[in-house]
Design a protein with these regions (language model features):
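Conserved ABC ATPase signature
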Residues: 115-119, 123
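Conserved catalytic motifs of ABC-family nucleotide-binding domains
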Residues: 74-84, 88
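Hydrophobic anchor residue at the start of the ABC signature
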Residues: 129
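Helix-to-loop junction immediately C-terminal to a conserved catalytic motif
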Residues: 49
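The feature captures the beta-strand-to-loop junction immediately N-terminal to the Walker
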Residues: 34-36
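Conserved ABC ATPase "signature" region
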Residues: 96-112
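Conserved structural motif at the start of ABC-family nucleotide-binding domains
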Residues: 3, 18-20
Length: 134
């Protein structure tokens, strides 16, 4: 299934950030958004994630609830453990042991229950990635 973006427009005040954007994103493909500051890259992603609404246009072939992203900044909750930072984004009653087992493939066991603010930068990044993929 593809994500089809048709004639998408978004304006902030009098600044037209997205103007008639048309893109087809094919399933199981990797894409990269590149461009100068202020061109609308983040706005487009925020619209795809349901965090922002377009002024006009349409997006089809996507269930907003299934979209996740990894921010440039980690956006972790510093006082929570790696496990709890992943757990907080999961719906329902996530199984703590299952999260622990999944995290063990990317983090040492003794770091899983530590507050993420005590982890190295690389470890924090791995927690952020695990959360985005959850």
């Amino acid at each position: 299934m593809s994500i089809i973006i048709t004639d998408l427009c978004k304006t902030f005040d009098d600044n037209e950030v997205l103007k008639n954007v048309n893109i087809t994103l094919k399933d199981n493909s990797i894409y990269c958004l590149m461009g100068t500051s202020g061109i609308g890259k983040t706005t487009l992603l925020r619209i795809l994630m349901g965090l922002e609404h377009a002024d006009s246009g349409s997006i089809s072939g996507i269930d907003i609830k299934s979209v996740s992203c990894m921010f440039q900044e980690n956006r972790l909750i510093p006082d929570l453990s790696a496990i709890d930072n992943v757990r907080i984004v999961l719906r329902g009653k996530p199984n703590r042991q299952e999260i622990r087992n999944n995290l063990l493939s990317i983090l040492p066991d003794d770091s899983l229950d530590m507050p993420v603010n005590s982890l190295s930068g690389g470890m924090k990044r791995r927690v952020a990635l695990a959360r985005a993929l959850s």
